[in-house]
């Protein structure tokens, strides 16, 4: 049995192809490609298929195409039991040229939970581009908290760190806060030279949550260097996850 698993976040998508053997699962190949966005967002369906296709291509490398027996994608923004989940399943089936009954699309939080705790109670807290917490009790009942999209519920995620860091940079540029190398680093990463350029950049549809999240490491570095305001951002984010 040849199985493809996809972990699709808003920043990148990872693909791993595994073969079932007498000794269990053996990894055949793996790679990563583009990230996804919400299916109802502009070009959402096209980006979803591109994420699957690009990560599969990266995993295969120079290999010939493999005939898959099953595929599962855990993707950011897929809500269990919704019409959106069915659409995502149809899209992965189309992209992989597989029958719909051989593929499954679900939320990445659920694949993480079942991967970490296949047959036991447990809790998974994900803080990536976005954030979500999901758990299962000893009766098999599952519950989730958070994960309602970066526009509504990003506290504790990389998106939120980058977003708040940019807010700091604008206050620095205005003179409302003392200037700090964080501002220059953030703007350099965005190829911006002014507050007006930053404002224009963040409303670009291609920037989105992943654009903010990519700036998060710079905020963490500034906190490690002693910037009090950056440290406050990290503490607020950590508290939001508890």
Where are the model-predicted features located?
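Glycine-rich phosphate-binding loop plus the immediately following alpha-helix
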Residues: 40, 141-192
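Short beta-strand scaffold segments in enzyme catalytic cores
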Residues: 13-19, 114, 125, 131-136
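Short beta-strand-loop/turn "lid" adjacent to the catalytic site in phosphate-handling enzymes
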Residues: 37-40, 56-95, 105, 114-117
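Short glycine-aspartate micro-motif
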Residues: 3-7, 68-72, 122-126, 133
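Short glycine-rich, Thr/Ser-proximal phosphate-binding strand/loop in the N-terminal lobe
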Residues: 2-47, 66-67, 141-143, 147
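Acidic-glycine-rich active-site phosphate/pyrophosphate-binding loop
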Residues: 131-145, 213-216
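Adenine-nucleotide phosphate-binding core of ATP-dependent small-molecule kinases
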Residues: 45-47, 51, 191-242
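Conserved phosphate-binding catalytic cores of ATP/NTP-utilizing and phosphoryl-transfer enzymes
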Residues: 100-124, 141
